[in-house]
Curated annotation (Swiss-Prot):
Location(s), subcellular: Nucleus
Native source species: Fusarium oxysporum f. sp. lycopersici (strain 4287 / CBS 123668 / FGSC 9935 / NRRL 34936)
Conditions for induction: Exclusively expressed during infection of common bean.
Superkingdom per UniProt: Eukaryota
Lineage: Eukaryota, Fungi, Dikarya, Ascomycota, Pezizomycotina
UniProt gene name: FTF1c
DNA-binding region, residue range(s): 137-164
Main location (coarse class): nucleus
General function of this protein: Zn(2)-C6 fungal-type transcription factor that has a role in the establishment of the fungus within the plant and/or the progress of the disease. Regulates the expression of virulence factors such as SIX1 and SIX6.
Name this polypeptide is given: Zn(2)-C6 fungal-type transcription factor FTF1c
Amino acid sequence: MDFTHFDDFAFAYYGLPDQASLASLVDHTHMFQSPTAFPQHQAMSGLAHSGLPLGTLPTGNRSQSMEGSKAPPDRTSPASNALEDPTTDEFGLASRNRVGGIDLGGKPKEDKADATPAWSGLKTKAGKERKRLPLACIPCRRKKIRCSGEKPACEHCLRSYIPCVYKITTRKAAPRTDYMAMLDKRPKCMEERVIKAIPKSDQEVASSVTRPVVKPAIPGTVPSSKPTKKRSAEEAFGPDLEACAKAPSEPKIEGDNGPSNLQVQEGEENKLQHEGTEALPSKDIQEHLADVFFDNIYGQSYHLLHKPSYMRKLKNGTLPPVLVLTVCAVAARFTSNPLVSSSGPEFLRGEEWASHARDICTKRYEWPNLTILTCLLILGLHEFGTCQGGRSWALGGQAIRMAFALQLHKDLEYDPSGRNGTKTQLSFIDREIRRRIMWACFLMDRFNSSGTDRPMFIREDTIQIPLPVKEKYFQFGMPAPTEMLDGRVPHPPSPNDGQIADVRENMGVAAFLIRAIALWGRITTCLSQGCKDLDSNPLWEGKSHYMNHLNDAVNLEASLPLSLKYSAENLEVHKTENTPSQFLFMHICLQHNILLVSRAAMSARKQHGVHDDFFSEASKRTFNAANRISELLREAEQSGCFVSAPFAGYCAFSSTTVHILAIISRNPSMKLTAEANLTTNVKYLHKMKKYWGMFHWMVENVRTQYRNVLDAMRAGANVEERATQLSFLQYGDWFNRYPRGLSDAEFMDPATHKRKDSGADGVLDAKPELRSVEKYFTLPTPRRVENKDTIRAAAPKRKQSAKKQTGMPAQPGQHLDSLQSIDADAVSQEHKFSGGLGLQITGAAGFNPLAASNQQNPDFSTTMSPTSPANMTAFAHYAHTPTFFPPELLAMNFGQDSNGNIDPLDRQLIYGGYSMDASTGLGHGHTWSL
């Protein structure tokens, strides 16, 4: 056989006898097999042949094999023929060295040397001898058979002529987990997410907390040298959290070009600097009204604005127009400048400026700032004067909420509204302005909530700021520590600060005025809001609410510093500081607290069985406090100081009601003193009603009480009996009297009023349209609507027709004749009434309460109030009417009403409600005007 035909193969030759017959059986399937797949053949000596492309083999071994060496042939070699091998069957399976039973599953007997695997010499990580195969090859793993573990090729791969590959990986083999094990791992994953979300500042607290073990580790998988305690949260997730914190912010979403809240607020604040400029008066009027504001309004009730800063910014034109409009609106009532004054009443002069300022403020409730808050407080005071109870109540509530939103109830050193995280330290003047604005909200809450069923919103313990400093310290910017409302000192002075050591000396009129109003708020809460009924102790007991309030009122006046105690010298000192009105107002409030507490004991004599000694002492304190208030008002008038605070007018009203009681006293000296003090108080109330509209109602109430007391004196009543019948009028009750200002709606004839469904009643129950028979006969029958135009058309001709038809019989079927007779009677009664009282009504400007009433129903013709806007010109006669009480006034003969009853003291005066005769006691040439 020619070997040139098999250049690509090297066979192990055994010298077969018939080579030609086997030439056609050469296995060509391994013709292109790489020699590297059979590494065991590389050590053998191959036959040198020039035709081998893979390299030249040594000739020695080749020749040796060709010569028929006795060495056993390699049956794995390509040169061997399995079909001619006697130890193989027709399927190529080896059958050499088989013994009985092997084909039935037995194991061949091998030597001990051959049974030792190749990997037995390897050691484990612990240094022990390895007993198990560390890693099986990929083909054996796929076929799921036992791998011998030899490298680079195992025994199975060599027999099967397939590549033997071992997968080398660094991942540890972990046991398979079932579904329950996966559920156990979820809490651990959730815990890791929570830890990643913890801020950096909270890591110190979380670092000491060990993480819980969700599932115990498999025994043997955790080395014994590893500690069992888990790592802390900071150690495990600290780098990740720090990297997350330092990561740049996410880019803005495309299309989201809307402005942020901060940008909107800054835009509104910039707009506030120019909005309302077109409504401002001239520069001269602005400066004039600013001086009027600081002379008549500042310090009386509210200590708002810093005068040097305000005037400097006003001249420079850097003030927001809304603030200038607000100041001009509230100050216009006190000026006599002809450019500001109008034909209407004084308390309505600044309404045009106030309307512009009110519109600007109410649109900015979303963006609170100190400017809007100050405007709300001043506008609330202005609406108080214009009898707009609803507006004043709403503006006060909005101001209180805004003050808490700005954190004015806290004494902060830095501005809480710092932009971009910057902290701006507040100066002393800025901190004092913030304190005074908050205290103004506190005072407004006490004033507005003093009426019945109006609880107070601000608790005293929520305000953690000191009281205002003296006025001169505030004007000149001199820091000084003061006490809080409860007497604590938040910042006690040190010897090295250079401040005044006595904290009470740093407190001026404003601080003690706030304490007086706070005490008055507690007293009114106890008397008018049900706290008095909850007191189980009698009034004269030392633990009762009454005695606690009485002691607080007396001790507050006694605790004043020497510079604030009332004296002529201290009044002159305050004149030099331009604060005499504030000084007088503070002492009026202190006396009013004593009057209020003591008068409550007088009213409760019969109800609680008060002892005579206790009642006598309470009566003495009440009359002394009332006299003291009148003396302060008289001294203010003599010294040229006008106390313009509205609450001072209410104190004068309370004092007046006590003087009216003293008129029927059997003590001549008390009676004379009461008459003189009553004159002083009524003159002061007449002056106040020009600037604050609600005092028209109080003046009429005083007139009613005076008439009722004179009627009671004729009936033989004494002071004690009259005091128990007296119901006390609260300061905040004017809200119910004037909820929406002065309008004709509150004087409308109820018989002609047609019920309409309003939008405010949309959620309430539907009212029946029909009336029962009982209501049909008891309620007055309303007039027909079609008669209204006829009555209005005939009104201008009434007087002329009355003159023509005097003495003529009335023709039947003419409704005008009945109206003429009614009008004639009303006019005659009007002249009798005005002549008897001596009211100076002249010309067209005179007030005509009966002619101005509704002519549709004469039964309601006497209910018109002199404060109707249709008759505002009637207010002018009060300035020219002399106000005095002559001695003959006590001898006037006032009749009772038709039923013989005496009206209560707190009712409004109703014209025509008393029978009077001008010839008996009212026609002696004396003039009486309240």
